[in-house]
Structure formats: structure tokens, C-alpha cells
A protein has these predicted regions:
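N-terminal cap/lid segment of alpha/beta-hydrolase-fold proteins
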Residues: 21-86
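Cap/lid segment of the alpha/beta-hydrolase catalytic domain
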Residues: 55, 98-107, 117, 124-152, ...
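Short beta-strand element of the alpha/beta-hydrolase
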Residues: 88-96
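Active-site glycine-rich loops that stabilize anionic/oxyanionic intermediates
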Residues: 95-100, 275
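Primarily recognizes the serine-hydrolase "nucleophile elbow" in alpha/beta-hydrolase
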Residues: 152-235, 253, 258
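Acidic catalytic loop of the alpha/beta-hydrolase fold
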Residues: 226-227, 276-280
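Short beta-strand/loop motif that positions the catalytic acidic residue
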Residues: 265, 271-273
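C-terminal catalytic histidine-bearing segment of alpha/beta-hydrolase fold enzymes
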Residues: 272, 279-339
Length: 339
């Protein structure tokens, strides 16, 4: 994540906002379910109530506003069932927002609309981002960020994957066809889930935590925090300092963040990014791709010359925004859905 993050991921800076709304609620017919039945692990101080904000016309995406959610201290999941035919596959979706807020519609509910139309169950995770977007932060501010700077988002993701597997039969899901899809910081969370599944970061709560939290496949769209240079930038903002001196002779642009320990057990992965992305550098995808290939992990990557950052599924003049068809084809290639 480059210094432009001080504008908070371009669109989701919310430097110009419309009227502040109440806490986010899903569309009628869908219910948010708290993922933690009791105390939330590694809870941070709450700076205020959860709020949803809508961007004003200076921050439109494909001519439409977007909604960002911040001050999330009680994470939830919302399940969206397939329309018509059920493929048996499921995807847990991680919206982006720099680990400071969540692009809940652009990179959340709109993704679920697409997935369910393709016969895929979607589970939207509203993971913890306990505070308001924007920099700089005082030392006393709730700590959030990529793992291991903060364990909260990864804990929420691990817990949700276990819950989806635990309820697979009830929800008509194949427990061996459950993947993850994320954007920007949510793309980093995809990589973290793909490489930190052997052990939960929190004490087991119930039977759901006995289920594997390894995704069966992973989709990272314009991911951040993955290259060594991105990790070094994160470290200067207060993340794990070890990356500053990690492999001083390594290529900092194409070397992988050491907190993403890729192995041959990392699930098959799809990567997509634009070369003119000025929030998360294309080297984040390249570094992860190289590490995956080196470990023998099936991986497909699509790089486009133009397209920028934070476009979600909204079609623009740039070909990169046709990526959902590429993902659908790839899911057939790896036998998660029928071709």
C-alpha cells in the first residue's frame, strides 16, 4: 500500500461524504449473524457506533456512489443463497478499505449478487475495522491493519470459514468447494487466509472451530500488502518491524511479504490487477504469483494496462472490469463449478 493510501484507497477515502447513516443493514430477506457468540477475541476499544457513509459525486465509481462502513467492532456474516440452480460452491467475500473501513456494496453485496446469479452461495463477512478512516492516527487509537499488525480481520475470517463448513449440509454447500474472494486489503486477507490456516489465532469457541479454515480456492482482486516493498511501507506505519531488515539482498519489489508464508498447501489462486493501480502496486500481485509458482500452487494471473483501483464489479470503459467472466471460467477449470 503506497502513500496514496493516505487518501484511503482513492474512492474510499470518504474525504467528501453525504449524510452519515446508521449502522449498515443488508437488503430485505437477508440477516446479519454475529460470528462470535460471546466475547470477541483481541477486542479493541470502540471509538463510536458503527456507521455507513455514502460517497458524494466527487467519489463515484462507474457513475454511482458507494457505501463504506467503519467502526465495526462486532463482526457479522450475511448469507446469500443461489438464485435457481445451486452449484454447491460457496465464496466468503472480504470487502476492501485499507483495514480502516469496508466497501460494503461495491466490493460486497454487489459481488454476492453476481455469485448467487451463477449458482454460488455467497457469505459476506463484515470483519472488524474498529475506528474511523483517515491518517494519521494517535498512538491510543484502536489498532487495525494486516496480520500480524492486528489479528482481528484474520480471526474473523478463520471463524467464518469454520462456520460455513460447519453449516455446509444445512446450507446445501459442498464442504470441499468453499473459497474466498477479496479486494485490495481484502485481497491481502485472502492471501493471509490461504497461508495461515493450520492453526486458529484464537481459542476454540465451539464445534465450528474444529472445521478446517483452509479455503479450497482463492481470488484476490487488486490485492495489497503482499510485496516486500509494501510490507516495508506497512512497517513504517507501525506494523511488524522485522520486515525492515528481512532479506536485505532480496528484490524488494518482487520479493514476497514474509508474513505470507506460501507453501504447496496454499489453495489454487486467481489474481487480477491493473498496471496503473496507484493504490496497491501491481508488484503485489506479481510477488504473490512468483511465490505461488515457486511452491507449485496452481495460479492464474491477469494483468491489464489500465483500470486503476477500487472498481469492484462495476463496468467501466476498461476491459479489466470484465473480470467476473474470467473468474467464472477459472472456477470451471479447477472443477469448483461445471464448465
Amino acid at each position: 500500500m503506497k502513500p496514496l493510501l493516505f487518501a484511503l484507497c482513492a474512492v474510499f477515502a470518504f474525504g467528501g461524504l453525504s449524510a452519515q447513516q446508521t449502522a449498515w443493514q443488508p437488503s430485505p430477506g437477508h440477516t446479519q449473524v454475529p460470528i462470535w457468540p460471546g466475547a470477541v477475541p483481541d477486542a479493541q476499544p470502540v471509538t463510536g457506533p458503527e456507521v455507513a457513509r455514502t460517497t458524494v459525486r466527487e467519489w463515484l465509481v462507474a457513475g454511482r456512489p458507494a457505501v463504506g462502513v467503519s467502526n465495526v467492532s462486532r463482526p457479522t456474516m450475511t448469507r446469500y443463497s443461489p438464485d435457481g440452480k445451486n452449484t454447491g460452491a460457496a465464496v466468503v467475500v472480504f470487502p476492501g478499505g485499507g483495514y480502516l473501513d469496508l466497501a460494503i456494496d461495491l466490493e460486497g453485496t454487489e459481488v454476492c449478487d453476481w455469485l448467487t446469479a451463477k449458482g454460488i452461495t455467497c457469505v459476506l463477512l463484515k470483519y472488524r475495522v474498529p475506528g474511523e478512516p483517515g491518517y494519521p492516527k494517535p498512538a491510543s487509537y484502536p489498532k487495525s491493519g494486516p496480520y500480524p499488525e492486528s489479528p482481528m480481520a484474520l480471526e474473523d475470517a478463520q471463524r467464518t470459514m469454520g462456520l460455513v463448513r460447519f453449516h455446509a449440509a444445512e446450507w446445501h454447500i459442498d464442504p470441499h468447494k468453499i473459497g474466498v474472494l477479496g479486494f485490495s486489503s481484502g485481497g491481502h486477507l485472502v492471501a493471509a487466509m490461504s497461508t495461515h490456516f493450520a492453526k486458529r489465532l484464537y481459542p476454540a469457541v465451539d464445534a465450528a472451530d474444529k472445521e478446517s479454515c483452509r479455503p479450497d480456492f482463492a481470488v484476490a482482486i487488486y490485492p495489497g500488502h503482499l510485496s516486500l516493498s509494501a510490507a516495508q511501507w506497512d512497517a513504517k506505519q507501525g506494523a511488524k518491524k522485522v520486515v525492515i531488515h528481512y532479506l536485505a539482498t532480496a528484490d524488494k519489489d518482487l520479493g514476497l511479504n514474509p508474513d505470507i508464508p506460501v507453501t504447496h498447501q496454499t489453495p489454487p489462486t486467481f489474481l487480477l490487477q491493473a498496471e496503473d493501480d496507484n493504490v496497491d502496486n501491481v508488484n503485489d500481485s506479481l510477488a504473490y504469483y512468483i511465490a505461488l509458482k515457486s511452491a507449485g500452487v496452481p495460479v492464474e494471473m491477469h494483468l491489464f494496462a489500465r483500470g486503476g483501483h477500487a472498481f469492484g464489479l462495476r463496468r467501466t470503459k476498461f476491459p479489466i472490469t470484465g473480470w467476473p467472466q474470467l473468474v467464472e471460467t477459472w472456477l470451471g477449470t479447477i472443477a469448483m463449478i461445471s464448465k
